[in-house]
Curated annotation (Swiss-Prot):
SUPFAM superfamilies: LysM domain. Transmembrane segments: none annotated. PROSITE patterns: LYSM (PS51782). This is Uncharacterized protein YqbP. Residues 139-160 are annotated as: Disordered. Residues 139-154 have a biased composition (Basic residues). InterPro entries: Bact_Kbp, LysM_dom, LysM_dom_sf. Residues 159-217 form the LysM domain. It comes from Bacillus subtilis (strain 168).
Length: 219
């Protein structure tokens, strides 16, 4: 015989589980406020408008044999109840959490589920469960602005730099571009002149430059 107007249900599609023993208390929280609600005094639960995802946690037990605390007869064995919840966890799909007599009817993900040997009778299983409201993000339409063709700036004539003692293309790239790894830009436009000045630049590209040598510095 049902002892309370409140029934705790967890389901996934047509697969359902009614919890045999009501928890003494459930904790409901969101990013705006926290509250503890006694099962015996359930009433209308009001949340601040547009709260964050609600989190619900509680603990109870699955009885092995008929218990005076059980809400109904023919409840599943602890092993079957645990197997069902673990199957939902592994599916990585949301479940529906419903408490009759209240406005709690949420699509949730199972964040935590743990169980231990019961403290009351042999074969019972105490458990703790934490659920988090599952919210799907609705797609938003984004208006794309029409791209206007930007006029390409006219290429300016390459700058000329006179090599000083101790200069390297690596250092010059760092000086003009703020990035020494771009030394090949300078090498590319000066390749012929540098090889003509020293054939060693064939084997060691850009390595051989000399004081007084003029190099083009592309923009």
């Amino acid at each position: 015989m049902t002892k309370s107007i409140y029934e705790f249900w967890i389901s996934q599609g047509k697969d359902k589980l009614r919890l045999p023993v009501l928890p003494e208390q459930i904790d409901i929280s969101n990013t705006i406020q926290n509250e503890s609600v006694k099962v015996a005094s359930f009433g209308e639960i009001t949340f601040i408008d547009k709260p964050g995802a609600k989190e619900i946690s509680f603990s109870s037990f699955f009885p092995k044999k008929h218990s005076p605390l059980a809400e109904y007869k023919g409840f599943p064995s602890p092993e079957n109840a645990i197997a069902k919840i673990e199957k939902w966890v592994k599916s990585k799909k949301p479940v529906q959490f419903l408490i009759t007599g209240t406005k709690i009817n949420l699509t949730c993900s199972i964040e935590v589920f743990s169980y231990t040997e019961g403290q009351k009778d042999i074969g019972d299983r105490d458990y703790e469960i934490k659920l988090k409201e599952y919210k799907t993000a609705s797609p938003r339409k984004i208006k794309q602005k029409k791209k206007t063709k930007k006029k390409r700036p006219s290429k300016s004539a390459p700058k000329t730099y006179t090599v000083k003692k101790g200069d390297t293309l690596w250092d010059l790239a760092g000086k003009f571009y703020g990035d020494s790894t771009k030394w090949r830009k300078i090498w590319k436009v000066n390749k012929k002149a540098m090889i003509k000045r020293s054939k060693r630049n064939i084997r060691q590209p850009g390595h051989w430059i000399f004081p007084g040598q003029k190099l083009k510095i592309p923009q």
